[in-house]
Amino acid sequence: MRELKRTLACPSIYARAAALDMVESVSADATVRKEQWQLTGTVEVYGNKSRVAVEVSQPEENRSELHIKMLSPAANLSADGQNRVLLFLADGIEQLLENTFAQGNKEERIG
């Protein structure tokens, strides 16, 4: 089973929201198990449908651990293809977080 782990510089509440947004954008059946906060769904990435699990934990304040597992890869999806799916999801989650925090730091001046 392929998996990817990534450390994110934010509290888990933000990482979980970004993970949910990202998975829902490429999945029709995303579900969250709230006890351990595990998100599962069948995602369609590059035309291939694979089942994944996403978990977010917070080992320290303002730091989250993102863990994405390939539960059931698309038929005939190579190991490299599976890695690309995991990277696509992790990069998308990280991009959503960057956009969120960049907008929060944005100043506007009128006049």
PLM region spans:
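Ser/Thr-rich, low-complexity intrinsically disordered terminal regions
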Residues: 1-111
